[in-house]
Design a protein with these regions (language model features):
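Substrate-binding N-lobe of the ribokinase-like
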Residues: 1-50
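Short beta-strand scaffold segments in enzyme catalytic cores
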Residues: 5, 50-54, 62, 176-178
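Conserved phosphate-binding/catalytic loop of the ribokinase/pfkB sugar-kinase fold
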Residues: 16, 41-43, 53-90
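Short beta->alpha connector loops
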Residues: 20-22, 95-100, 118-122
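Short acidic active-site motifs
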Residues: 77-81, 99-102, 123-126, 154-155
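Glycosyltransferases and closely related glycan-assembly transferases
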Residues: 86, 101-114
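Conserved phosphate/ATP/ADP-binding segment of small-molecule kinases
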Residues: 108-115, 119-178
Length: 178
């Protein structure tokens, strides 16, 4: 949601899709307040997914995740949403939903440009063909988890070697990004 709102504030026409829980009206209201199109959001009678991010005095974060409705995506729902988009459209994903591998495969087959923020980094990513990613947007901790390297230059080098077609933005906490 934060990425959708930030893009909408920058003047981009943004559609946000996903499954929200019974308490999700606040999320819908926030998105709509900033001009995010919520046509493809579906509300379910279960608890929604949510994330708590703790940031220390050095700008480093720790993420606590409850999957909720974010883990209830179906292939039918994904196909229904993707049917409204076309080649060249951007799809921004985080690793907070199920069926990520299916979504990446389908969007790529349609010619969409896939931007992936692999947060939270976990084993689900190994099921995804990450060669289909147009742009990785990750922090240095996720970069280390991907590559085993701590140095930002080494992280970028390894990621560029492994995914030569992808663009990479590596955020460095309080030190900006590269």
């Amino acid at each position: 949601m934060n990425q959708s709102i930030a893009l909408a504030k920058a003047g981009i026409h943004v559609f946000h899709a996903g499954l929200i829980g019974e308490e999700g009206k606040l999320l819908l209201d926030e998105c709509r307040k900033y001009g995010v199109d919520t046509t493809f959001i579906r509300q379910l009678p279960q608890k929604g997914g949510h994330t708590m991010i703790q940031v220390d005095q050095n700008g480093q974060n720790s993420i606590i995740l409850y999957g909720g409705t974010n883990q209830m995506q179906t292939e039918e729902y994904i196909d229904e949403v993707l049917a409204h988009f076309e080649e060249g459209d951007f799809l921004i994903l985080q690793n907070e939903i199920n069926k990520l591998d299916y979504l990446i495969d389908r969007a790529y087959a349609q010619g969409m440009k896939i931007v992936l923020n692999p947060s939270p980094f976990d084993e689900k990513l190994s099921a995804c063909d990450l060669n289909k990613i147009y742009l990785f947007l990750l922090n240095e901790i996720e970069g280390e988890q991907f590559t085993g390297c701590k140095n930002p230059d080494d992280i970028l080098e390894k990621l560029n070697d492994k995914y030569p077609k992808a663009k990479i933005v590596l955020t460095l906490g309080g030190n900006g990004s590269v």
